[in-house]
Swiss-Prot record:
One of its GO terms (cellular component) is cytosol. Its EC number is 6.5.1.2. This is DNA ligase. Residues 593-671 form the BRCT domain. DNA ligase that catalyzes the formation of phosphodiester linkages between 5'-phosphoryl and 3'-hydroxyl groups in double-stranded DNA using NAD as a coenzyme and as the energy source for the reaction. It is essential for DNA replication and repair of damaged DNA. Its cofactor is Mg(2+); Mn(2+). HAMAP family: DNA_ligase_A. Zn(2+) binds at residues 408, 411, 426, 432. It holds the Pfam family Nlig-Ia. It is an enzyme of class 6 (ligase). Keywords: DNA damage, DNA repair, DNA replication, Ligase, Magnesium, Manganese, Metal-binding, NAD, Zinc. SUPFAM superfamilies: BRCT domain (SSF52113), DNA ligase/mRNA capping enzyme, catalytic domain (SSF56091), Nucleic acid-binding proteins (SSF50249), RuvA domain 2-like (SSF47781). The lineage of its organism: Bacteria, Pseudomonadati, Pseudomonadota, Gammaproteobacteria, Enterobacterales.
Amino acid sequence: MEPIEQQLTELRTTLRHHEYLYHVMDAPEIPDAEYDRLMRELRELEAQRPDLITPDSPTQRVGAAPLTAFNQIRHEVPMLSLDNVFDEESFLAFNKRVQDRLKSTENVIWCCELKLDGLAVSILYENGVLVSAATRGDGTTGEDITSNVRTIRAIPLKLHGDNIPARLEVRGEVFLPQAGFEKINEDARRTGGKVFANPRNAAAGSLRQLDPRITAKRPLTFFCYGVGILEGGELPDTHLGRLLQFKAWGLPVSDRVTLCDSPQAVLDFYHNVEKDRPTLGFDIDGVVIKVNSLALQEQLGFVARAPRWAVAFKFPAQEQMTFVRDVEFQVGRTGAITPVARLEPVQVAGVLVSNATLHNADEIERLGLRIGDKVVIRRAGDVIPQVVNVVLSERPEETRPIVFPTHCPVCGSDVERVEGEAVTRCTGGLICGAQRKESLKHFVSRRAMDVDGMGDKIIDQLVEREYVHTPADLFRLTAGKLTGLDRMGPKSAQNVVNALEKAKATTFARFLYALGIREVGEATAAGLAAYFGTLEALQAATIDELQKVPDVGIVVATHVFNFFAEESNRDVIVQLLAEGVHWPAPVVINVQEIDSPFAGKTVVLTGSLSQMSRDDAKARLVALGAKVAGSVSKKTDLVIAGEAAGSKLAKAQELGINVIDEAEMIRLLGA
């Protein structure tokens, strides 16, 4: 071995050792400046002999040239998600289910961890060397983020120690500590860059950079929590034992992993972590509870996309107090007027909240809310801000009532509130600019006509410049006219025109959904399309005939009937067809001739599916003669419950309706 090769090997070994002490053991032996000096020395030597650079060298973390797109990686072992519980009662019920399934009265030993609020990733090591990394994606296929993961200093490019498996895929969470998040946003505000709403968004944005050099500048870190592939080696037979082995090989593991020998010990762990949450230095949204024994995990198995041996115990939504500075009124695509509270900005669960929906006039009355009031804000599910209550004991002297508008705040048309409904609506229809904008945004959306590149800002400009009044006008746009819009060059304009042309080929169900008929969602649109087959038959249907469609009651039937009775709506449909919008002719299915357990059955899908998309499942069920409905009723024959099935599953059980899981559905589809 040449002297320079020996020097390179020693430097790399030294740097890996100090990375391990810093990121895994949290016990650095040298100052950052000394680490930087060693890194500079290694870079200088590698510059002299680039032929001696190895892929696992610490210098190779900075990334290669920017990518144009992410490749896909299929997970050999699916990356499953967890079911959630939100209170002690639900956790104790979960604990009982586990014990009942194990037919044991002895307490289960639980391994409890933090539920990190970051991005789940899988990292594959072959003979101890990092070879690939991927996002969770849909659980089956993720994005190849290898170049970006290599830039995260907490993740070893090469494992160290003995008995490392030939192939080892570890799973874990990439996240951004709060200090790093604040620094990124501080720099962004100073330079006019993108300011992130919370550390999770910043971590996601950093990890999905096409340029790994940008990712390298972000202080991302990582904790390992599980394993996917294991070949050519062995691991301990407990979850905690595996985590300790990962740590010995150089992978970072949270120091808050704890074994609990009773349900009460789990609850104590949960409450201790909840109390420490503000001081952890990074965001979490609960704790994860897993059966520690791998043998018991195997015995318990899986259901749908989640293991029976683990659960996420989520924290309650965080709340903060702030002041309502004003209330504004927004108009949606159906004319619904929604009051929105403008708040004194406040941090809630890691997000700066300045607005909260007030839903409707009844909600304002229920709260007894006045402008100027001090209120409690909650981020329900840590996402949607809402006003929980007014702090009446601290009501300021200078408050004023909230006056609901008698005319549309956008177009000035009269407003109406139908008896029995909580929503107040603008009566202006498409003469209302707000309704027109929202209707067009819905029309071009991904699940409707799916016009790629037609974003909200483009729609706003088209309406404001009076270029577009109805959906049919979209298909009359030219690249020349679009080029006149802000930030729209000739190439982008032509891309939009091409996307509009492509969108003309659709399905009857998508077309109905795109029309934006009140109360007609995707499932109802699919049901109407399947039942009537043609637009002509649907337009001619009476209210009674419409109610024969699964999931369509008197309210929905009336909305559909009234929509097609309106001459202006019929005119728009005629224009759309004249512009070339079309869909395949219906395939007539004789249910009596179909040999399938689904033929003639009304089926409801609920929860998430892991083996296929919901759209694919619906299409296959319909092809086998099923009627797929969007809600559970006495007319429902079968409910297919995927992951995180909620109220629909509960209602099915209450009504005694037959319920099957995804695995059984797939078996029956192939029957």
